[in-house]
């Protein structure tokens, strides 16, 4: 439909603060993945380390392990496996620390940008800067392109899909479409609220008594959160004027 010129959907604009949030979040997400990979790889290398080094490092916490590995002596003949392992552990640990600092910088930028773009959204229970960023990215800079909260829920993959048949009615199933990152963000909000938010806890108890499964209750709650957050999206005609330092 898009290539034929017959599409009716309004495309996202990429000229505002939400686009800045999107590209910063891409950098942060890739850094987080690399950060996790560095720790997993370091522990895998440690398994094959010499016994004395492994016995020294294995009891440490993750934070202590990273700091200890970063200070390992890397001098010696690199052809010696023991030296090569120390070199590898030190390199992975320093990479982990560098990525940790990079993630901190990206997170600070995202917090500032989302606070400037949608401060009311961040005040809602269970909504952090990462969730707010996903909601803003899903809607785009021109939030008026999403005509209704139902359309926004569909974008987030949170709208109900009828699953009835000739023998059943009123049943729905999970929506596997939409923006899966936004759907995951809604899921995190719901899980937090199911544990700590009294109105949500009461809702879960009531719906459970009515015979709904936990999966169906979560589906209903994601739809509610999508409706709630849609109403807090910023107006496209009034972009924030806050200046964010790089």
Model-predicted regions and their roles:
Residues 45, 185, 189, 224-232:
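Amphipathic alpha-helical segments in well-ordered regions
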Residues 208-245:
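Basic, amphipathic alpha-helical segments enriched in Lys/Arg and hydrophobic/aromatic residues
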Residues 5-10, 38-41, 100, 104, ...:
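Short helix-capping/linker segments at secondary-structure and domain boundaries
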Residues 20-120:
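Glycine-rich, often acidic, oxyanion-interacting loops/wings at catalytic, nucleic-acid
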Residues 1-15, 19, 60-71, 168-177:
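Short alpha-helix plus adjacent loop in nuclease-associated cores
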Residues 122-123, 129-210, 214, 242-243:
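Phosphate-backbone recognition surface of nucleic-acid-processing proteins
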């Amino acid at each position: 439909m898009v290539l034929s010129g017959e599409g009716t959907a309004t495309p996202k604009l990429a000229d505002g603060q939400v686009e800045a949030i999107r590209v910063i979040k891409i950098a942060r997400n890739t850094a987080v993945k690399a950060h996790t990979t560095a720790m997993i790889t370091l522990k895998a290398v440690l398994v094959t380390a010499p016994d004395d080094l492994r016995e020294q490092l294995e009891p440490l916490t993750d934070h202590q392990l990273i700091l200890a590995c970063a200070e390992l002596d890397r001098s010696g003949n690199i052809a010696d496996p023991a030296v090569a392992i120390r070199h590898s552990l030190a390199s992975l640990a320093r990479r982990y620390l560098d990525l940790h600092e990079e993630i901190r910088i990206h997170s600070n930028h995202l917090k500032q940008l989302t606070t400037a773009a949608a401060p009311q959204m961040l005040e809602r229970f269970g909504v952090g800067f990462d969730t707010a960023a996903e909601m803003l990215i899903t809607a785009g800079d021109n939030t008026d392109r999403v005509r209704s909260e139902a359309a926004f829920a569909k974008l987030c993959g949170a709208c109900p899909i009828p699953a009835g048949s000739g023998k059943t009615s009123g049943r729905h199933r999970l929506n596997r479409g939409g923006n899966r990152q936004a759907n995951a963000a809604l899921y995190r909000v719901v899980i937090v609220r199911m544990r700590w938010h009294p109105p949500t806890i009461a809702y879960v108890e009531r719906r459970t008594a009515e015979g709904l499964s936990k999966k169906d209750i979560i589906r209903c709650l994601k739809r509610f959160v999508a409706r709630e957050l849609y109403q807090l999206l910023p107006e496209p005609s009034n972009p924030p004027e806050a200046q964010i330092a790089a």
